[in-house]
Regions:
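A structural signal for well-ordered alpha-helices, especially hydrophobic packing surfaces
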Residues: 78, 104-111, 129, 133
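Short, charge-rich amphipathic alpha-helical segments embedded
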Residues: 90, 94-120
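Flexible helix-coil transition and linker loops at the boundaries of alpha-helical arrays
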Residues: 86-90, 132-135
Length: 170
């Protein structure tokens, strides 16, 4: 899967021209070439997620591999959550769905546009988190922050996007 569409590629010329260098660094150093991505992503999931993140780490050889590999392990976690649900193992179902939501979120970060693939991953992430919330054992509610003209605009290098927050407790 290509992380950039042709229109995005034209807008980010330097990234496109130097992509070979980033791919060489990832091939040499691995997925954590610039930051402790695996560590901070896995932290809320706990040690049970370590095999998933290690699989991604071992299989990513270039930038375009990142979204695909995270999505694949996310789908596998969804399957495990469904099997746990059918077997009546609520705690396992909860863990698998939470981990899947994190994995799908990680699959989204190297996609720089609102493509069909990014929207698919967003839907999978939200569905997994909603499934987690159903059996969380504590209140989990979706809250939308509205601005004057719709969702509260936030963003970084991209266009504004709806804000999502989480808060423990009441």
């Amino acid at each position: 899967m290509t992380a950039l569409t042709p229109s995005a590629t034209r807008r980010v010329r330097r990234f496109t021209e130097q992509r070979w260098l980033l791919d060489a660094v990832i091939q040499t150093v691995g997925l954590e070439w610039d930051q402790g991505r695996i560590g901070y992503s896995m932290a809320p999931c706990g040690v049970l997620a370590a095999p998933d993140f290690e699989r991604v780490r071992s299989r990513v050889k270039k930038f375009d591999d990142i979204a695909r590999e995270f999505a694949e392990v996310g789908v596998a976690r969804i399957r495990r959550a469904e099997a746990a649900r059918q077997a009546g193992h609520e705690a396992s179902e909860r863990e698998h769905n939470f981990i899947a939501s994190i994995l799908f979120g990680q699959a989204q970060w190297p996609i720089f546009e609102n493509t069909e693939e990014n929207q698919r991953l967003e839907s999978l992430k939200n569905a997994a988190y909603a499934a987690y919330a159903r059996v969380a054992g504590h209140p989990v509610r979706q809250v939308e922050l509205r601005g004057a003209a719709g969702p509260c605009p936030v963003g970084c290098i991209c266009r504004p996007a709806p804000a999502r927050t989480s808060r423990w407790g009441a």
